[in-house]
């Protein structure tokens, strides 16, 4: 006879137990270790500091659970042990973090997962129970983000940053601002308006506690964002290249394509007409070579062939215009760089401006030749108006580098070496990561490697530096290469993600949006294992999942079946 049979009180506690599930598992493990025929349950309860009524209830519940559970006894004992409770807690936390918070899985589907896995015999899978877990985790995610933002900001080194800004609609207005190098979200919140004052307020709240200076804002040409950047932040406005190219596509692509399709239809019509006349001509000649209609038919065939040739030439002209327009549009992206992507040589703002102007001139010429509508020409004019800002962005890039080099107090040869070799090499590396094709990525990486090899020649300046000095200069060169930001694609991509989540959930609350921001900044990792927060603050944050394990409530037990009355 074991000790629990000597317990005099067999009733369950009527009050809700203040004991955590893991603590109960620890006490039951202590009981199993001390249990013997020579010691009573009351004595064991005193030794492990648990009321004897409570201990008896725990033991009886565990034994009933072991008898009624469909899992093997050893598996059930494991899940009832402290380590088993920890495992269940880890599974529930991971499931909610990955399935519910990050990937929009419904709570009923999550309960289904627990049912199919058999874990519903150890954890409560009801909608209400899992809703409580989801709400608690959402609150914890927001709390973690706030605490880590404050903690990491204290030790963050001061620096200048770029912001990419844009709005999206759910249909509520959602303002989004991201630091593009780290991909860290600074602003992501719903607001009733999207004017400059609203942008100023949102950015000021976030930037107030950070040792950063916004020196550049990349976005579309929204007047509110431009005013916010130039007036409130005192930053340079860098136009987003995508919107410039988008205007040129709207102006030329569809119109020229429709003319090509029309020319193709005319050519097919002319070919059918020519073929029909040839059939009549051949049929008439077959009937009689002296047919007086043959000369007339021959003239008709000749005129049809001439018309077909002219139509074919018109089609070639339309196709050539399309190809030239596409090349000009692509040329805007190819040449809008402070470094020549073919040679790796630095380019001045005037050189870049001249190249870009040539592409705009080509598009204007094609519009005139094709007789495009006034609306199309207005679109081209709108895109061309951004040329000055694009050229100014190149000048801003080199001005910022000059200011950095002056602040670092480098010698003239070292400054020249950084400008001509090291900075362009690292810029080409970044351009290679964003190239459209594998062939272009390989070419740019190869060119960057060649320039880096030249810059690191032991016979040059590189050979005169210590290893620490070499690492420091390479870090400085990478910082300089990051100054040029011509695209707000990081924000556009984030807006697309939010649209998909809004479509799945039908509504994104302010709290849910905050939780998603924290997941983006502190959970999503790149291939090197770094998070956006680590790249932005320059220090590793606490592990989000481990923090959730420490703060999220342990999973509740499933409700026991009610006794029949």
Question: Which role fits each region the language model picked out?
Answer:
Residues 9-29, 53-100, 128, 158-159:
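Basic, short loop/linker segments at the boundary and entry of helix-turn-helix/winged-helix-like folds
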Residues 27-30, 55-58, 110, 166, ...:
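Mobile genetic element proteins and their domesticated derivatives, centered on retroelements
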Residues 36-37, 103:
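Flexible coil/turn residues that form the inter-helical turn or adjacent wing/linker of helix-turn-helix
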Residues 40-48, 110:
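Short alpha-helical "recognition helix" segments of helix-turn-helix
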Residues 79-243, 248-345, 351-359:
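RNase H-like nuclease fold core
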Residues 340-343, 347-451:
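Conserved small-residue motifs centered on glycine
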Residues 420, 424-435, 439-468, 473-488, ...:
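C-terminal domain-tail junction helix/linker
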């Amino acid at each position: 006879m074991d000790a629990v049979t000597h317990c005099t009180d067999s009733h369950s506690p009527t009050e809700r137990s203040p004991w955590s599930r893991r603590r109960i598992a620890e006490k039951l493990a202590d009981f199993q270790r001390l249990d013997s025929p020579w010691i009573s349950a009351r004595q064991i309860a005193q030794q492990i500091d648990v009321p004897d009524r409570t201990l008896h209830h725990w033991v009886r519940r565990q034994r009933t659970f072991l008898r009624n559970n469909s899992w093997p006894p050893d598996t059930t004992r494991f899940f009832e042990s402290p380590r088993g409770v920890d495992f269940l807690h880890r599974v529930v936390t991971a499931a909610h973090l990955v399935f519910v918070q990050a990937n929009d899985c419904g709570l009923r589907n999550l309960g289904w997962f627990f049912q199919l896995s058999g874990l519903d015999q150890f954890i409560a899978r009801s909608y209400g129970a899992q809703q409580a877990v989801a709400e608690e985790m959402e609150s914890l995610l927001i709390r973690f983000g706030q605490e880590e933002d404050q903690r990491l900001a204290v030790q963050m080194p001061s620096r200048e940053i770029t912001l990419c800004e844009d709005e999206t609609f759910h249909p509520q207005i959602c303002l989004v601002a991201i630091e593009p190098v780290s991909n860290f979200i600074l602003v992501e919140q719903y607001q009733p308006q999207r004017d400059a004052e609203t942008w100023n307020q949102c950015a000021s709240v976030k930037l107030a506690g950070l040792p950063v200076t916004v020196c550049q804002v990349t976005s579309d040409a929204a007047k509110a964002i431009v005013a916010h950047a130039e007036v409130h932040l005192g930053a340079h406005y860098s136009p987003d290249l995508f919107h410039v190219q988008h205007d040129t596509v709207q102006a030329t692509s569809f119109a020229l394509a429709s003319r090509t399709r029309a020319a193709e239809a005319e050519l097919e019509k002319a070919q059918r007409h020519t073929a029909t006349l040839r059939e009549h001509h051949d049929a008439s000649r077959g009937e009689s070579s002296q047919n007086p209609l043959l000369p007339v038919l021959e003239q008709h065939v000749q005129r049809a062939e001439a018309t077909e040739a002219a139509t074919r030439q018109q089609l070639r002209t339309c196709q050539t215009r399309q190809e030239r327009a596409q090349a000009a549009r692509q040329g805007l992206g190819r040449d809008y760089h402070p470094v020549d992507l073919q040679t790796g040589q630095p380019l001045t703002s005037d050189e870049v401006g001249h190249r870009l102007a040539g592409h705009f001139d080509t598009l204007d010429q094609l519009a005139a030749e094709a007789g495009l509508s006034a609306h199309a020409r207005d679109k081209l004019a709108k895109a061309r108006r951004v040329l000055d800002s694009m050229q100014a962005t190149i000048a801003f890039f080199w001005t910022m580098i000059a200011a950095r080099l002056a602040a670092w107090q480098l010698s003239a040869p070292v400054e020249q070496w950084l400008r001509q070799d090291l900075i362009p090499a690292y810029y080409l590396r970044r351009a290679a990561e964003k190239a459209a094709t594998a062939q272009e990525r390989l070419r740019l990486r190869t060119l960057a490697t060649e320039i880096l090899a030249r810059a690191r020649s032991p016979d040059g300046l590189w050979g005169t530096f210590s290893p620490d000095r070499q690492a420091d200069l390479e870090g400085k060169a990478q910082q300089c290469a990051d100054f040029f930001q011509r695209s707000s694609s990081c924000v556009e991509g984030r807006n697309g993600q939010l649209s998909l989540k809004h479509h799945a959930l039908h509504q994104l609350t302010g709290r849910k949006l905050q939780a998603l921001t924290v997941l983006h900044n502190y959970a999503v990792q790149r291939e090197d294992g770094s998070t956006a927060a680590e790249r932005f603050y320059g220090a590793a944050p606490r592990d989000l999942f481990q923090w959730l394990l420490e703060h999220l409530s342990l999973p509740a037990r499933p409700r026991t079946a009610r006794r029949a009355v």
